Swiss-Prot record:
Molecular function terms, GO-annotated: N-acetyltransferase activity
Lineage: Bacteria, Bacillati, Cyanobacteriota, Cyanophyceae, Synechococcales
UniProt keyword annotations, A-Z: Acyltransferase, Transferase
Xref: PROSITE patterns: GNAT
The enzyme's E.C. designation: 2.3.1.-
Stated family: Belongs to the acetyltransferase family. Ycf52 subfamily.
Cellular component annotations (GO), alphabetically ordered: cytoplasm
Protein name as it appears in the record: Uncharacterized N-acetyltransferase ycf52-like
CDD domains: NAT_SF
Keyword presence, Transport: no
InterPro entries per record: Acyl_CoA_acyltransferase, GNAT_dom, NSI-like
Annotated Pfam families: Acetyltransf_1 (PF00583)
Length: 171
């Protein structure tokens, strides 16, 4: 398991700084007055989350099921763009877990206007760091083909040690 020791080396990732009210701030270089904050608050406007998912072209899911998924997740991470007193949800990810060994990251999304600026990487580093804080050592995710290389650059591997993910779908 040399891979995991290298993957979880604390020197291998940079950390966002603390922002107001305990949220973590990610510096932006876009020249405007916006700042980006990460939080683990679960109290989010589900319709705002739906708008974020719509912006990237995801299929709509029933709000009641999204609410349940957020409530039952082990960890929820939100990313907010702050301009003055106005905040806008611009990123989201969540993880389910057995609370001991394993976690799976789901629903990683960054608003299209902020993609390719390092925010997806920062969001993933943040959620990995939080999961490692809880001593979770096996972190998995499912990726669409067009983002596999993104996750590879973060240290995720396909089929580590020959392990295959399997799915069961109802008829």
């Amino acid at each position: 398991m040399v891979f995991w020791k290298r993957f979880f080396n604390p020197d291998s990732t940079s950390s966002p700084s603390l922002g107001p009210t305990g949220a973590e701030e990610f510096p932006t270089d876009n020249g405007d007055k916006a700042r980006i904050f990460f939080t683990t608050e679960r109290d989010i406007d589900l319709y705002e989350l739906e708008e974020l998912c719509d912006a990237v072209g995801w299929a709509r899911r029933p709000i009641r099921k999204v609410k349940k998924a957020v409530e039952c997740s082990f960890l929820v991470v939100t990313m907010w763009e702050m301009q003055g007193n106005r905040r806008r949800l611009v990123g989201f990810a969540r993880a389910t877990s057995d609370h001991a060994f394993n976690a799976t990251v789901w629903d990683v999304v960054i608003h299209p206007s902020l993609q390719s600026k390092g925010l997806g990487k920062a969001l993933m580093q943040y959620i990995i760091r939080k999961l490692r804080h809880y001593d979770i050592s096996n972190i998995t995710l499912f990726a669409d083909p067009q983002v596999v290389d993104f996750y590879r650059r973060l240290g995720f591997v396909l089929d580590p040690e020959g392990i295959k993910g399997m799915f069961w779908y109802p008829d």
